[in-house]
Amino acid sequence: MSAVGKSAAVLVAVVCATAAAQASAATIEVKMTNVAFEPATVSAKVGDTIVWTNNDIVAHTATSRDKSWDLNALPKKTVSFVVKKAGGIEYYCRYHPNMVGHIEAKD
């Protein structure tokens, strides 16, 4: 195989691997409704995106207990977070501390 042919084959392999990795990532939706996260617990994989939609008329946050991320969701807006590591992630709303959620993230 020529050098050009080998380069093309490597390029195709890289593009396919990248596309497969992107295709496997999911978007998981959580609603902020009636001062609660719905669903309160979700399962995700590393690389998945969690999208919170604030359906309430007041602002909320999705704030990790370990303070590694803090998302402000204005009324009728969405915010998102890409899961970066496996494990249990507890989060809450800073404005409404009884509003709690959990992400169970796997590799």
Regions found by a protein language model. Give the residues of each.
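Extracytoplasmic copper-binding redox domains, predominantly the cupredoxin/blue-copper superfamily
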Residues: 2-14, 19-107
